[in-house]
């Protein structure tokens, strides 16, 4: 006779993963980033970085899944090869930012400013782009978004 407890183990593991409590950011990485604005390949899942001045920062290759950048200034930031899936980037200034190869799946970029940002090779599946300024941005296919690119890239 098999114990019923064996069947509960996968259910408990799934419940823990579903709450995302075990998917927290590394506090040392966060402190390093806040101090130096440089943290390549850092673990900053669910980090709260809203309303921050982060111009020219370098987060290349970092895990920023579900990070909150609401109303932050990331002008000229290096966000290449980052995981920004499900991140909150509403009203964020990403002018001239490097998002080359970034995963922006299901990210919220509504009313963000991506003027002249580089999105070459970025993943934009189910990304919210309503009201997003894309004029002059390099689109995922390498083409430049023309004047009037608001919420979508006009090539």
Where does each model-flagged region fall?
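Tandem repeat scaffolds
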Residues: 25-155
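A Zn2+-metalloprotease active-site environment signal
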Residues: 16
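Cleavable N-terminal signal peptides
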Residues: 11-12, 22-23
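Bacterial N-terminal signal peptides that target proteins for export
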Residues: 1-9
